[in-house]
Amino acid sequence: LATASTKEADVLKTLLLTSKNAQTVDVVNKVIGSADEKTQLALLDVLSKRSNPNSAAQIFNLLNSSNSTVKAAAYTALPNVVNDKDFDKIIEVLGKADAKDVNAAQQAAIVALQNNADKSNIVKRLSANISRSLAPSSARYFPIFAGEGSDESLKTITNYISQDNPLRADAIKALASWSNTSSLDALTTLLRTEKDATLFSTVFDGFIRQLNASKVNNDQKTILLKDAFEYAQNTRQKNTALGSLRATGTYSALAFASRFLEDKDLKGTATDVVMNITADNKSFIGTDVRQWLEKAQNNLSGSESSYLREAIVRHLAEMPKGESYVSMFNGKDLTGWKGLVENPIKRAQMSAKELAAKQEIADKKMRENWKAEDGSLVFSGHGDN
């Protein structure tokens, strides 16, 4: 390897990676420490792809190499060779690592913790250790909690998201990159309260990713995505929330997307959502659906537009007559809405005159507490309506 050309070195590495000799990795482990720089770099690449439990010790040694190139390669290989028993050693390495090597050390810690039999106790111990400090270095451990993903880890990180905490930004970043969907509630709260544009962007992207991956039912997902759209601070975020509605397949998502079929910044995404939801739900029929599809058809452009137009024409031709869904709310005003008068038994005991009088009072109260706003029905009061 020391005298091999680049092409020859690649061939030799392939041989080491594919060798059926059970001793191959042991030989690599044995020689890597004393090899020249070129050989060490080649063998580090091999160990990052093929290793055994004894490989970690050699990598840890090379993390202290005076050769910066070898040291960097050793950090790159570290997550691929660590064992469960190495966790404490990795934490020690993480505490001393240069900024450019921190991510590799964090990933190695996550790997060593993932299937560790003592994982719960390790997390509690690590949580207790960092809880005593607000030093910037404590944030180095946040991605480990995010990667582990337990309730204990979530509790640890949410302790840092108060407005006056100096590690708040790092904690938010950890919540947004959580390895499962358990941080969704925390992200939902932050979505509705975070004002800083940079932090909001982190929260928003994490929220959308977590919500899409969650087991939240499609109707609730639709509501949350519509919320995300309203809180979005720029066009990219609005398109992201709008596009995610496609997977919910709900009529509410379809109707919401249809509102943006003529918006110059959003009509491309809205068109995609409308076409796909209607194509996947043949029961969505009626005048509104026809009009939305016709608008979507007019928005199409590009190499596939003719094919997609034909698909819409065919869909419209096959669509049964009639209405599948009639909204109680017209999206504009409170026409047809009435306040609730008592219960059915009491109403039945009232005279027509008494009922009419009480209905007038209930309607007035209803209009004080409810209003149509931006296509939504909004409750703004504290009554029983």
Where are these regions (language model features)?
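Alpha-helical, heptad-rich or low-complexity scaffold/stalk segments
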Residues: 3, 10, 76, 93, ...
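Carbohydrate-interacting regions of secretory-pathway proteins
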Residues: 298, 307-385
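Residue-level detector of extended alpha-helical repeat arrays and alpha-solenoid scaffolds
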Residues: 9, 40, 56, 71, ...
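Amphipathic alpha-helical scaffolding segments comprising HEAT/armadillo-like alpha-solenoid repeats
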Residues: 1-3, 10, 21-33, 40-41, ...
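Short inter-helical turns and helix N-cap capping residues of alpha-solenoid HEAT/ARM repeat scaffolds
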Residues: 4-5, 35-36, 66-67, 97-102, ...
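Hydrophobic beta-strand residues in large extracellular and virion-surface proteins
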Residues: 28, 43, 74, 126, ...
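Repeat-solenoid scaffold signature
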Residues: 67, 72-82, 169-185, 193, ...
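Core register positions within helices of long alpha-helical scaffolds
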Residues: 11-18, 22, 46-49, 77-80, ...
